[in-house]
Amino acid sequence: IVANQPQSLAGVLDIEASEKAARFVQMCDAFNIPIVTLLDVPGFLPGVDQEHGGIIRHGAKLLYAYCNATVPRISLILRKAYGGAYIVMDSQSIGADLTYAWPTNEIAVMGAEGAANVIFRRQIAAADDPEAMRARMVKEYKAELMHPYYAAERGLVDDVIDPAETRQVLIDSLAMLRTKHADLPSRKHGNPPQ
């Protein structure tokens, strides 16, 4: 199981977390152990130290590890799944075999407040009461684009499941993927990010 810890730095991916998860995914793949990823990730840790340390390069290692893994891969989005960090945490777009989400999921480029500030900045600035307009735009953005079934409608998740059914859904999914076979490309080895 690969999971974010929302009680530590809100669950963001930093250099160390990306490295640790990449090694773990590669280890599971090497020994043919299926991978279940539990997502609650608001993004990569911002900051000059992270940028100078190579957060993009280290995040790419995690992306590479997931993309090369041939074992069964199941993802479950618990709450937040924002931006590039969501993509590298075994999203449907990089080849997760099955992706589920709880009704509390939020899949987006960023949170509703930040997105509304960027998308509707002109309307907010032109409003008589900018704070009221911002609150209204955030509410509309959440209602239209961040409801739990929006991701399923767009094919980002296979199903929205009841949290009480999670254990059985994962058991059934692992049983279904037990005989997964992946055709490998005809190459000696990959070229991972350094």
Task: Name what the model sees in each region.
Residues 2-194:
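Ligand-binding clefts of soluble mixed alpha/beta catalytic domains
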